[in-house]
């Protein structure tokens, strides 16, 4: 909701969708700039909340200094989750090992701060499941699969582990 193409009519749009009984929005960041924007929008509306993180494709730009800023932002009272985090192997511009390293670090941050995680999983199902299991995510925090393109049997396995699912873009293709 904080993206530039909403600038012209954002307030009108948000008023309208709230009148249509949308009770809450969790607006995720994909880097520092968008995480800060998500918080700014959440501060403006009592029914909008933010999630902060580095999106898988953006982790190639992430370093310890930027991670420290994400940790700082994550402690804001309107930040309710760490996300959108995960792995995206569809695009080849960020090495898998870089994505995996920062995925783990962001899971650990969520656990440390007691916040749920919002997961992006595109063409990386086995590695996402393995890392979530190895980090104890299902036992130590709540897990929301936001972008999910895996199989029905894997979805059932995730549900059995207590995972939540949102309706996201992949249902359209």
PLM features per residue range, with description:
Residues 1-173:
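Mid-domain alpha/beta scaffold segments of enzyme catalytic cores
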């Amino acid at each position: 909701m904080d993206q530039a193409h909403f600038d012209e009519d954002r307030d009108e749009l948000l008023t309208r969708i709230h009148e249509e009984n949308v009770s809450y929005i969790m607006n995720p960041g994909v880097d520092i700039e968008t995480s800060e924007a998500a918080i700014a929008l959440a501060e403006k509306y009592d029914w909008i909340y933010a999630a902060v993180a580095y999106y898988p494709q953006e982790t190639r730009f992430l370093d310890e200094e930027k991670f420290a800023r994400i940790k700082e932002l994550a402690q804001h009272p309107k930040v309710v989750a760490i996300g959108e985090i995960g792995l995206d192997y569809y695009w080849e511009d960020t090495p898998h090992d870089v994505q995996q390293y920062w995925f783990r670090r962001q899971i650990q941050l969520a656990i440390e701060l007691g916040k749920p995680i919002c997961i992006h999983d595109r063409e990386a199902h086995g590695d996402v499941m393995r890392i979530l299991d190895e980090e104890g995510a299902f036992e130590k925090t709540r897990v929301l699969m936001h972008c999910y393109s895996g199989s029905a049997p894997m979805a059932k396995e995730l549900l059995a582990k207590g995972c939540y699912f949102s309706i996201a873009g992949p249902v359209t293709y």
